[in-house]
C-alpha cells in the first residue's frame, strides 16, 4: 500500500482526549486527513469506536474491547468469549460488590468479550475471582478490564492489518495505557503520550512530553517529519 502516511493504530481515552476525557476536536481533522489506514484501537465497546470513526469522517476500522472485537471491511471479528467473564461478574456481585456503573451500565451494555469494572471497586477481590476463572485484570486508568490474558489490541491487529493489505509491523501506534503494551510490541513504531502510565512508557519506542491530545498531535508531527 503506497500512501503518504503509514498505517496508524490509535487509542481513544487519554490519547485523543483531553484530561476530562472529552475528545480534543483538533484530532478529528488529523484523522480525517491521514493518508493511510487508520485503526481506532480501544478498550471501549465497539459502538463507541465506530461512532468516533463516523464523526471523524473516516472508514470504520476498529479494534475494541482491548482486542476482543474488531471491525474492518464490513467484517466483524471476535477474539474472545464472554462466558467466563459473565461468571466473574456474577461472582463479584455475589461477594457483595457492584460493577460500579449504575443500573443502565452503559459501560458494559454493548460489550461482548470482556467486563469493565469501576476503579472504585476492590481490585484484589476482582483479580482473585478473575484468576479463578482463568482471566486477568488490566487497569487502564479508566476502568478495570477483566479479560483473557491472550486477548489484546496487539494480538488482534495482524488480522485487521491483513484485511487492509498490510502487516502489523507497518503500523505506527499511539497510546497511553497498559492495554497498549501489546499493541506497541506488535507495530513498527510506537509513541506513548506524556500522561501515559509506566507500562505504556516502558513499551513505547518514543515517550512524548506532551500529554493527551497534544501528545497525539506531537506524535503526528514526528511521524511526518
From Swiss-Prot:
List, in alphabetical order, the Gene Ontology terms for molecular function in this entry.
Answer: magnesium ion binding; phosphatase activity; phosphoglycolate phosphatase activity
User: Can you list the GO cellular component terms from the UniProt entry?
Assistant: cytosol
List the catalytic residues. 11
Q: Which cofactor does it need?
A: Mg(2+)
Keywords linked to the UniProt accession? Carbohydrate metabolism, Hydrolase, Magnesium, Metal-binding
Q: What is its EC number?
A: 3.1.3.18
Family matches, as PANTHER family: HAD SUPERFAMILY HYDROLASE-LIKE, TYPE 3, PHOSPHOSERINE PHOSPHATASE
Query: What family is this protein classified in?
Result: Belongs to the archaeal SPP-like hydrolase family.
The UniProt function text for this chain reads: Catalyzes the dephosphorylation of 2-phosphoglycolate.
This chain belongs to the protein called Phosphoglycolate phosphatase
Q: Which lineage do the record's taxonomy fields give for this organism?
A: Archaea, Methanobacteriati, Methanobacteriota, Stenosarchaea group, Halobacteria
Amino acid at each position: 500500500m503506497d500512501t503518504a502516511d503509514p498505517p496508524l493504530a490509535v487509542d481513544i481515552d487519554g490519547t485523543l482526549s483531553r484530561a476530562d476525557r472529552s475528545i480534543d476536536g483538533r484530532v478529528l481533522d488529523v484523522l480525517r486527513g491521514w493518508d493511510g489506514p487508520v485503526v481506532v484501537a480501544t478498550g471501549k465497546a465497539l459502538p463507541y469506536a465506530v461512532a468516533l470513526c463516523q464523526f471523524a469522517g473516516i472508514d470504520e476500522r476498529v479494534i475494541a474491547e482491548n482486542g476482543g472485537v474488531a471491525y474492518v471491511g464490513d467484517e466483524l471479528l471476535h477474539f474472545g468469549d464472554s462466558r467466563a467473564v459473565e461468571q466473574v461478574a456474577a461472582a463479584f456481585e455475589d461477594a457483595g460488590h457492584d460493577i460500579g456503573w449504575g443500573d443502565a451500565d452503559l459501560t458494559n451494555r454493548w460489550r461482548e468479550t470482556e467486563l469493565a469494572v469501576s476503579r472504585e471497586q476492590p481490585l484484589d477481590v476482582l483479580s482473585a475471582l478473575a484468576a479463578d476463572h482463568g482471566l486477568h485484570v488490566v487497569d487502564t486508568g479508566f476502568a478495570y478490564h477483566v479479560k483473557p490474558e491472550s486477548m489484546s489490541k496487539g494480538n488482534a491487529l495482524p488480522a485487521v492489518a491483513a484485511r487492509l493489505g498490510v502487516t502489523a509491523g507497518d503500523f505506527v501506534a499511539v497510546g497511553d495505557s497498559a492495554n497498549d503494551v501489546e499493541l506497541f510490541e506488535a507495530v513498527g513504531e510506537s509513541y506513548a503520550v506524556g500522561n501515559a502510565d509506566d507500562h505504556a512508557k516502558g513499551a513505547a519506542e518514543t515517550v512524548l512530553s506532551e500529554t493527551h491530545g497534544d501528545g497525539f498531535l506531537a506524535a503526528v508531527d514526528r511521524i511526518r517529519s
